[in-house]
A protein has these predicted regions:
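Residues that define the transmembrane beta-barrel architecture of outer-membrane proteins
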Residues: 49-57, 86-92, 130-134, 161-167, ...
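Outer-membrane beta-barrel channels and translocator barrels
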Residues: 64-68, 99-103, 142-145, 174-178, ...
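Outer membrane beta-barrel
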Residues: 62, 69-154, 278
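Residues on the lipid-exposed face of transmembrane beta-strands in outer-membrane beta-barrel proteins
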Residues: 57-63, 94-100, 136-140, 169-173, ...
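Transmembrane beta-strand segments that form the barrel wall of outer-membrane beta-barrel proteins
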Residues: 26-28, 40-44, 69-81, 106-108, ...
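Outer-membrane beta-barrel "beta-signal"
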Residues: 332-360
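Signature for the C-terminal beta-barrel architecture of outer-membrane proteins
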Residues: 139-266
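Outer membrane beta-barrel transmembrane domains
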Residues: 116-123, 249-257, 265-267, 271-321
């Protein structure tokens, strides 16, 4: 990786345009979760149903230093509806992006947090509850490979608080109509000089394979590093998911929980709408992925779902989804989502240069 960056940074001069532009991204969402609370050992629990609605704004300035290198400075703001506080959360956006190979990107600073991990490992609700991640990231989206590796440093150690970081990886290889993937998420609490308690580790991984019965043809995405297929598809995936948690218990004793399960998914796309049937076999009070959807702690469920995205323009989309699940005890849960996304940008300045000076 470092050798590729070094080689890329010492290429002969080439034409480029330095430019500064302003961008604004907006996502207005309504998400309703109808669930029955289930007590699980703290800090894990299946929460009761709730409704989240609001707008997430991302205003930013982007400066293109040279071809393949740009800096992004801005902010992320959460504006929940129905609250008196206005902006409930704000995060800075400070990123350096280096596109060093076709389809490959290295990021330092604020990360792209739309990780393609399974919901059991990385809950998609975090999109609305945890606005930003900061650290380092390597992403790839090519014809046969999809990669997302990142380090998110969430908390620095103090005299009374443990440090916290999250290390994640998603690697998907797509030879022909087959798919193989490896997914890993490690959540660590620790440090050496604090009174916040002993070190804790939560490690979850998944091994998966799949097959599509129709030929998958890669299509350039409207959004960077998000895979889209230019054809209808029907197929299945199977994942083995394992969770290992070691947390502090009472009287400075550690409590270790380990469990695993199988996730089967049958999917098809018709009328530009995604349909799927998913079966989860496994899970228990000992299946405790710290950043995963807590519904997987409940043993065994079947789920039907559908999702559709309407593109009104290249920069305006509406997405709707619905899923309903039946659990082993007969409980029915369902989730509805409606979101509207739009993007605008305009150039503030542009300076064209015929060549980039060679570095000596």
């Amino acid at each position: 990786m470092l050798s590729l960056l070094f080689f890329w940074g010492h290429q002969p001069g080439q034409a480029f345009s330095k430019s500064l532009k302003f961008t604004l991204d907006s996502k207005t969402f309504f998400k309703n979760l109808e669930r029955k609370p289930v007590p699980v050992r703290a800090p894990f629990r299946i929460p009761s149903g709730e409704t989240r609605t609001g707008t997430i704004l991302k205003p930013a300035f982007q400066y293109n230093i040279k071809k393949g290198i740009n800096i992004e400075l801005g902010g992320l703001m959460d504006l929940p509806f129905g609250q008196d506080d206005g902006i409930s959360e704000g995060e800075p956006v400070i990123s350096l992006h280096i596109d060093y190979l076709p389809g490959w990107r290295f990021t330092a600073g604020t990360l792209n947090r739309e990780h393609p991990l399974l919901d059991a490992i990385f809950d998609d609700d975090l999109e609305f509850t945890d606005l930003a991640e900061h650290g380092f990231q390597i992403q790839a989206d090519t014809r046969k490979l999809r990669q997302d590796f990142w380090l998110d440093w969430e908390l620095n150690e103090t005299s009374t608080r443990r440090e916290k970081f999250v290390l994640g990886n998603y690697t998907q290889w797509m030879p022909g109509n087959f798919m193989f993937d490896l997914q890993v998420l490690w959540v660590h609490f620790g440090g050496q000089n604090n009174s916040g308690g002993p070190a804790e580790n939560n490690f979850t991984y998944a091994l998966g394979m799949g097959y599509s019965f129709s030929k998958n043809r890669f299509k350039e995405s409207r959004e960077p590093y998000i895979k889209k297929w230019n054809s209808q598809k029907t197929g299945f995936t199977v994942h083995y998911i394992n969770s290992h948690d070691r947390s502090a218990g009472t009287s400075d004793n550690f409590v270790t929980n380990k469990d695993s399960g199988l996730l089967f998914k049958l999917f098809t796309t018709h009328w530009d709408t995604d349909f799927y049937f998913r079966v989860w076999s496994g899970g228990s009070r000992h299946f405790l992925p710290r950043n995963g959807d807590p519904i997987y702690t409940n043993r065994d469920f079947e789920e039907l779902g559908m999702e559709k995205t309407w593109w009104l323009d290249d920069d305006i989309s509406i997405r709707g989804s619905y899923q309903i699940s039946e659990h082993r005890d007969g409980t029915i849960t369902h989730t509805e989502l409606l979101s509207v996304q739009w993007h605008i940008d305009f150039t503030l300045s542009k300076n064209h240069s015929d060549t980039v000076p060679n570095q000596h």
